[in-house]
Amino acid sequence: MSEQATWTHPAAQQQSSNIAGDGIFASEDLPAGTIVARLHGRIVDDVTLRGLLADAAAEGGYVDTIMIDDDQNLVLAPDQLIHFCNHGCDPSLWHLDATTICTRRAVAANDELTIDYATQTTHADFEMTCNCGSELCRGTVSGVDWMDPDWQARYEDHVVPAVRRAIQRWGTA
């Protein structure tokens, strides 16, 4: 994939969020299954990603990335609207495939569009405090949430391929 911009649905708009900073909100009703984003960026391996993350941390910056496959991470181009997509433990978005994100259910105008960050990584060192406020809030989001059978049932195949394979391997261990 090239360093081209990520496409986002025209109804996705940046606004102030109660979850964290700014978020992405629907400016109109979106039916379930509506494609909201097609991610583009630069694919890097895990070693390169760790270097990018360390450099960004040292400079007070941020690297927007998702794990799309084993040892393949998509680093999104800077200044993309999708950067403002906050985590939610009962999200309105999920993956159709590694780089396509759609609505998980019908979304009303003015609702925040969120995605479960744990559907995008198996990196065991990933962990963050959650502020989503949903009834399903886990309090902490991590790169090992995929090990929870209830979590697996909720998302089924709507995760990146690396998470899907980790679940399959774990289930046969």
At which residue positions do the language-model features occur?
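Catalytic cores of histone-lysine modification enzymes
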Residues: S2-L93
